[in-house]
Structures are given as structure tokens and as C-alpha cells.
Amino acid sequence: MIRLLSIVLPVTLWLAPAHAQERAPVRDAIRIVQLQPAQGVLRRYPDALPSLLRHMNEETGAKFDTDPLFIETLTDERLFQHPILYLNCDEQPNLALPEEEKQALRQYLDRGGFLYLDAGIKASFLGADLGHSYAAWEERPEIKELFAGIYPEKVFVPLPRDHDLFRCFYKGLPDNNDLKIQADQKKLPEAVLTFVEREKWPQGTYSFVGMRVKDRLAILASPICAMGWGKDEFGAWIPPISFRIRESAEGFDENLKLASFTGGTYEVKREDGLNDVIYSEPGQRPLWVREPTGKWRISKYYSGEEISNYAHAFYTRIGCNVFLYALTN
């Protein structure tokens, strides 16, 4: 039986070799297991999880080993010695696991283990290298297929905004103390702050889907969070993050419906069950969206130190809540 220890995070794309040198674990510390690709495959955000674990050690009184234990296969017996398995789905070329690994994963979850599938939600309209921050409350097709073979009787369900995960340690959105920049720079542009508070991350929540095993939340999937956890050796957030928000203006509803485009359209499910339609151009970021009400808005990207720091602070708070919730529930 897995012993769940009771206890009392910073993202641009960085690549590193998948294999890290194994070293002795920290005594009496909680160690996170991370699935890595095969030898020689580069992994994304190598500084992310260690940075998040250091943050939790500093801010929560928890004691985590800041070096994850990397395993190459889910049949590795060391998996069963630790309560949490972290998997960045963007690092995996595919998730078509052999049957013995599927059985090992089911056994791990049935015995009390917790699986966090970072980047387990991915919007097709964003392309391979872009993050995701709103709507599309559905797991990736390969995730759905994998767990149909492990728990055929179960489905992923969106976490409601009032779920305990969103308030188990941090609550709400970051404030000025989280931004780590000069006071006169801390205020976000009004259009950005309004969209964040009302639509992007309302009440400090995020798009998660989960699956329950034996009456507990045992599997959690989200859009990529690791991009917001990393810090460099000087304590600065890496990488810079931009915000994608939706903006409207007088005449948009009439003009955009008449505009021409040569890219694809993508339906994205919202948490209210309705669909947005995203319009794009080849090789470009999403351009505009038609919402279920008939309203049209454009996607606009904002960048800057205060925006990037705000995003990192938010993703770190969410990451912290995920791991603390997993340990205490």
C-alpha cells in the first residue's frame, strides 16, 4: 500500500536531456516520480518541477526532495514507493503504453497513487508549441484512449470552479506581493486584468479534468502549467510568458463575420458545454473567435515583465495546490 505522507511553483520552452544522474534521495522528504521519454529524447521545462518543489519547501513548510525520481517505464517498482506520479504529456511522443504498463498504472492508482497529467488538455487550434489557457475542457484524444483501456467504465469530468483544489493552500489570483517587480510597474493593463478576472482565470481557477478512483480524485489533467514554474539560478522567472486575451470593439460583430480567412476553424468546448469557433490563418496564432451568443472577438497578445511575472505567480500557485491537494486527499 502506498503511504501518503501528510505535509504541512515558474514558463518558456527549455530543452534538456531526458536522463538525469540518479543520486541518493533526501531523507524523510516527499519525492515526486516523473515519467521520462526514451534515452536521448529532449524534455521540456527541465527546471520547472524542481523550481516548484523548492517553492513549496520555502512557502508551505512541506519537505520535498527537489530532484524528481525519473523512471523510464511504469513497471519500475520504485513507482509504488511514492505517492505522486507527474507526467508532462508534451514530452511523450505517444501514450500508447504496452499492456503491462497499463496494468501497473491501474494498480498504482488503485492502491492510492495520484497521477498529474500536465498538458493533458491541448487545444488543436494552438499548434504544437503554444500554451493554452481557456476553454477546451477535454482531455487530449490520446489520454482518452489510454484510460479507456485502463478504466473503461470511467470518464474524465471537468473540475467545478468551487472544487477544494482551488483553495487548499492558495486562494484567488496573485496580488502585488507575488509579482516581484517595482511597485510602479505592478499594475496590469486594464484590458488584461479585466479579462483575467472575468474569463481567463476567474477566482484563481483553471481548466482541469479529473477521474475518480475508489471515491477519490486520482487522476488530474490540465493545459500546460510547467511553463510557469521555472526559475534560473538567480531566482528570476523563466521563460517570459505573454497573455492571449479576447477583445471586442465597435463594428466587430458585423465586420469579422464578413472577413476572409484561409486557415482552419476549430470548435472548442467551454466549461458551460457550449462551443466557441476559432478562426485561424496558416502558420499564425488564432485570430478571432465566434462565441455561442453570436458575438465576435479578436485574440490579442500582451507581453511585458508585469504580465509575465503575474502569469508565473499564478501557475506556481496552481501547481502548489495540485501537489498539496494530492498529498492531503
What are these language model-derived features?
Residues 37-41, 91-94, 115, 121-126, ...:
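Solvent-exposed loop/turn segments at secondary-structure junctions
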Residues 20-84, 91-92, 226-227, 241-329:
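Aromatic-Pro/Gly-enriched surface loop or interdomain linker
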Residues 84-131:
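Short alpha-beta junction capping motif
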Residues 46-53, 102, 106, 140, ...:
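Extracytoplasmic/secreted envelope proteins and their assembly/folding machinery
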Residues 143-209, 213-225, 252:
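Acidic, glycine-rich loop-and-strand cores that form catalytic or ligand-binding grooves
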Residues 31-34, 83-88, 114-118, 155-159, ...:
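Structural recognition of the beta-strand scaffold that forms the well-ordered cores
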Residues 23-27, 77-81, 101, 108-110, ...:
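Extracellular/periplasmic catalytic domains that process cell-envelope and extracellular macromolecules
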Residues 3-16:
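Bacterial N-terminal signal peptides
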